[in-house]
């Protein structure tokens, strides 16, 4: 489908209160294209309100959420809660827009659901394409504008009355659908590759658990008790400190001055770039001067990275970085050059091990792990033939994950370049 799309650059614009738009487009207020309504929170003291079948969405459910549609959040409510608390069930296709810090997270209701009071939801009128509105709100221009018009200095909030008066560029429903179709093509590809990666990751981690935690393939072998691990392990397997077989390094202080970000092309990974899956998806960028002045190390592609300090430490995220990079000092790195056939064994090991380690973190204001806390942890080392066999089984899975991730990054770059040009009419979709 993508290769059959025909675009053209728009050449005829008209001046409006929101700037230049194509001469055949309109400007409409949100209140003219849909109903704006909020949600609420049932009393948490009444157990009968919670654990039902009705999805209840909060802004937290949209944090780091990259899909267009959402069907449910962390919690559900009951019919009793809806009736007694005057909650509204929003229909499929409703635009869910967060109105409190953070302002501007957006998704589309995949099915009927409810939200808390941290949303200003838009129920589009007939003929209005939900996906077009979704992509419009995803632009940096709209996101920043919504924050600018939100009242409150300490706790900014986008009021419903304010949102209703927001003016937006409004193409015909047919063109709205064309724009949404082109952009959702990229998002569909991205979602499919993400789902592939989730399945591949699950297979690899299950295999690791089966072999090196449950020891299922080795049940018939002789087992011996190991003091360091406080459990029985197959005879002939070694137990070593993690620091005895590899080096864990800390990232560098983050540059602050603008001079270090001019003509920046070197990926700089921060805590915010860590993800729940295998691969880092994005980064900030610094330049060669920052690399030199801060004595930063440039790590190799496919190195392993994880958090060692910060508020989100207990999420215990461990990632592989599919490109060369440097990292902030809140992160720890194991360079891929020292991993060889242990690469994916160590990655899987850390996925399980880090969860245990973070429960003993120090620091009340800012939880942190020392590098020594990690390097002094005892781990099991299987015989080389077993390690090589495991590597041969999971390497194709991880290589596919990494290749998928590289494709996702390219797809996102193309989508993000097209997004503002399409929704603001600079680029027109002629044919699909």
From Swiss-Prot:
Gene3D superfamilies: DNA methylase specificity domains (3.90.220.20). GO terms for molecular function: DNA binding. GO terms for biological process: DNA restriction-modification system. Pfam families: Methylase_S. It comes from the Archaea. Belongs to the type-I restriction system S methylase family. Type I restriction and modification enzymes are complex, multifunctional systems which require ATP, S-adenosyl methionine and Mg(2+) as cofactors and, in addition to their endonucleolytic and methylase activities, are potent DNA-dependent ATPases. Contains two DNA recognition domains, each specifying recognition of one of the two defined components of the target sequence. The specificity (S) subunit of a type I restriction enzyme; this subunit dictates DNA sequence specificity. In the presence of the R subunit the complex can also act as an endonuclease, binding to the same target sequence but cutting the DNA some distance from this site. Whether the DNA is cut or modified depends on the methylation state of the target sequence. When the target site is unmodified, the DNA is cut. The type I restriction/modification system is composed of three polypeptides R, M and S. This is Type I restriction enzyme MjaIX specificity subunit. It comes from Methanocaldococcus jannaschii (strain ATCC 43067 / DSM 2661 / JAL-1 / JCM 10045 / NBRC 100440) (Methanococcus jannaschii). The gene is hsdS.
């Amino acid at each position: 489908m993508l290769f059959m799309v025909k675009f053209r650059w728009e050449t005829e614009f008209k001046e409006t209160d929101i700037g230049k738009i194509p001469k055949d487009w309109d400007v409409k207020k949100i209140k003219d294209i849909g109903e704006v309504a909020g949600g609420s929170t049932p009393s948490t003291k009444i157990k009968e309100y919670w654990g039902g079948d009705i999805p209840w969405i909060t802004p937290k459910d949209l944090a780091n959420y990259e899909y267009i549609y959402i069907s449910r959040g962390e919690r559900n409510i009951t019919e009793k809660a809806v009736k007694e608390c005057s909650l509204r069930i929003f229909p499929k296709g409703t635009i869910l827009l967060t109105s409190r810090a953070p302002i501007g997270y957006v998704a589309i209701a995949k099915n009927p659901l409810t939200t808390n009071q941290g949303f200003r939801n838009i129920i589009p009128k007939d003929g209005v394409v939900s996906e077009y509105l979704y992509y419009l709100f995803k632009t940096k221009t709209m996101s920043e504008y919504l924050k600018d018009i939100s009242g409150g200095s300490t706790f900014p909030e986008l009021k419903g009355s304010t949102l209703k008066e927001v003016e937006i560029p409004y193409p015909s429903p047919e063109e709205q659908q064309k724009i949404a179709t082109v952009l959702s093509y990229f998002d569909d590809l991205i979602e499919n590759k993400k789902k592939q990666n989730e399945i591949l990751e699950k297979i690899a981690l299950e295999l690791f658990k089966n072999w090196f935690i449950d020891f299922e393939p080795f049940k018939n072998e002789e087992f011996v008790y190991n003091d360091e691990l406080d459990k029985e392990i197959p005879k002939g397997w070694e137990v070593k400190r993690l620091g005895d077989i590899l080096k864990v390094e800390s990232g560098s202080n983050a540059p602050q001055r603008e001079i270090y970000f001019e003509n920046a092309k070197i990926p700089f990974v921060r805590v915010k770039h860590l993800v729940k899956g295998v691969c880092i998806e994005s980064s900030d960028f610094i330049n060669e001067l920052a690399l030199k002045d801060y004595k930063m190390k440039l790590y190799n592609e496919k190195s392993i990275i994880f958090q060692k300090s910060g508020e989100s430490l207990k999420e215990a995220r461990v990632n592989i970085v599919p490109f060369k990079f440097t990292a902030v000092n809140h992160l720890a790195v194991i360079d891929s050059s020292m991993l060889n056939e242990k690469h994916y064994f160590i990655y899987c090991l850390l996925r399980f091990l880090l969860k245990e380690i973070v429960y003993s973190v120090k620091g009340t204001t800012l939880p942190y792990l020392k590098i020594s806390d990690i390097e002094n942890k005892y781990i099991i080392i299987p015989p080389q033939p077993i390690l090589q066999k495991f590597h041969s089984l999971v390497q194709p899975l991880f290589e596919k994950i990494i290749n998928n991730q590289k494709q996702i990054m390219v797809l996102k770059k193309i989508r993000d370049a097209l997004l503002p040009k399409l929704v603001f009419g600079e680029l027109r979709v002629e044919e699909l």
